[in-house]
């Protein structure tokens, strides 16, 4: 454990950010899995709506630096192919 006051604060902030980032990533993954589940059940109407939500969450995660922008683009592209197939 850190002894210096500023190091204690940084450790606390780091833990808070880690928890927040984990929450956002989990929400993002859930949205992607929802789209994939709807596509596999041939519910394309709801899949298109879920794709919009998942796309927004992927973009936001990329903007915040949680995932790389190219990774977000790649995931969105693959989801779009599945939804439009």
Curated annotation (Swiss-Prot):
It holds the Pfam family Ribosomal_S20p. SUPFAM superfamilies: Ribosomal protein S20. GO terms for cellular component: cytosol; small ribosomal subunit. GO terms for biological process: translation. Residues 1-22 are annotated as: Disordered. One of its GO terms (molecular function) is structural constituent of ribosome. Keywords: Ribonucleoprotein, Ribosomal protein, RNA-binding, rRNA-binding. PANTHER family: 30S RIBOSOMAL PROTEIN S20, SMALL RIBOSOMAL SUBUNIT PROTEIN BS20C. Belongs to the bacterial ribosomal protein bS20 family. NCBIfam families: S20. Binds directly to 16S ribosomal RNA. This is Small ribosomal subunit protein bS20. The lineage of its organism: Bacteria, Bacillati, Bacillota, Bacilli, Bacillales. The gene is rpsT.
